[in-house]
Amino acid sequence: MPAPAKTGQALFLGLELAVDQLRASIVDESLELIGVEAIDFDTELSEYQTQGGIFTTPGDAYTTPVDMWVKALDFLLEKVSRNYDIGRFKSIGGSAQSALVWWKSTPIPSFPALDSRLPLHSQLSPNVFSLANTPVAQDTFSHSHALALEATLGGPDHMAARVGTSAHASLIAAQLLRVREASPDVWARTGRIQVASAFLASLIGGSWVGMGEAEACSTGMWVHAAGGQGHWDDGVLDFIGGSAEEGRRVRSWLGEVDVSGGGRRIGTVSRYLVERYGFEPDTILASFTPDHLSTYLSLCPSPADAVLSFGPMDLLLTSAPHYLPTRLYNIFPHPAQDPSEKRKYIIMLNSRNADVPRALVRDMYTKSWSAFDRLISVVPPGGSIGLDDKLFSYWLLQGDSFPLSHVKGIFRFETGIKVNEFRDLRANPRCLVESQVLSFRVRWSRMVATGILGATAGRARGNNFVQSASSTASPVPGATGSQSGRTGTPVSIAPAAATTIGLSFDPYDYQSLPSRILTTGAAANFPSVASLLAEFRRIATRLQAGSLGARL
């Protein structure tokens, strides 16, 4: 039996279902971190034999066992209950990676019937899931299905205008289509699907939780509309299901979407958690969100800031005052806003070629992260001191976001000539990270040129242009409202030199850049990376825009 509740300051529990771990962060009323607990999938649940929390198979398929998440939650709650006074927790919220949970039509479990004397994983056995190993965000096996959907909807621009996103490798709609075509037995026995964040919230709350609109907008099946009038696209569902009847079945799997903006409580914790661990019955269950959006929210950025998250996929996120979908970026309704306020949105640029290329370059040229960091620091920008003999490298191990979705390979250039390897091997770490940052620099400016950020855009200013998450104290003072902080001149028209090479922006103009870049993730801990990011606008002046596209 759990210990009786003790008096003391209120605590708040945040759960994160990451690719490699299930983590719990405990904070107090002042948002001071009290402690962290984690279950590492590879080491503490080694019976599943995952590597980095996932299985890899030929064909760029990356999956993870859903049953492992359930067992990890049992272990994590045991850790938390041993080390903290459970009765002091007032609220639980969380986030999760991008993945789907496929429930069988029979038996769909009754959460209120769970026996508090038994762990969750003994009652939610693997046979309740129609798909035991579900694709994760790194999975690209469904890319051809995403392209088929895109073609059906009239191409990338028409698809983005209709459902808010164009085709990409981990599109949820494409995963559904692939399962129907490749695994009809899984399709036939499915009765419900949930995104991972809603799945985790359901386990904590003891009742079915639907996805929020921010996640629905990323599926490729949702039509966003003002005033909370969004809806599932019947035409897309019919295409995925193969018929109108199966389309209606998919609609029933998806369930209702929370269009309130996420600024409300889902409910309270389940009777199971109250009886087994000693949570108070009135412990609030807050909205659970996708991990990338929770990262953005956790740093409390101002509207003029951008958040750069390094990880298995690198992400650059910022806010937007209105909904203007294009193929150039992903856009989501803000997951935590008051329904009475003007709607806000979050834009995301992503790169699939992130941690893996960095780790490969480390292994090939330095053998350690400290040496990797050192070489980035000591090698001059562009890999050489001279102005005319700069080096470029592009590590595209997976098809990346538009316009590089069709390109794969490792490409190096010296003095404008493609080479197999640099003469100075030490330039590789620096040139890799530069190309990753330059990719975001170019795509940011293309995004700004669409007008999504309004008539004005942020100005990169001062020495505080880049801040790591650990050093971020507060948003820019006085930055309020949908466009506060995005000061400076209107977005400039691209000069003739830029337009002749097909650019819609001036690559030498830094005034459209964000006021600050708040960085998080493992790579953000490298001083060299922070220093390189501070050169965000300076290194752009040596970018021969379009050089990669012209040479590939």
Where are these regions (language model features)?
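ATP-dependent carbohydrate kinase catalytic cores
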Residues: 218-339, 470-498, 527
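Glycine-rich phosphate-binding/hydrolytic loop that grips phosphoryl groups
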Residues: 147, 291-298, 349-355, 359-362, ...
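Gly/Ser/Thr-rich active-site cleft segment
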Residues: 17-19, 27, 138, 150-290
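Short beta-strand-loop/turn "lid" adjacent to the catalytic site in phosphate-handling enzymes
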Residues: 60, 81-135, 163-170, 201, ...
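N-terminal glycine/serine-rich phosphate-binding loop of ATP-dependent small-molecule kinases
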Residues: 1-123, 275, 279, 283-284, ...
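Activation-segment/catalytic-loop signature of the eukaryotic protein kinase fold
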Residues: 388-537
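A short helix-loop
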Residues: 162, 180-183, 206, 237-238, ...
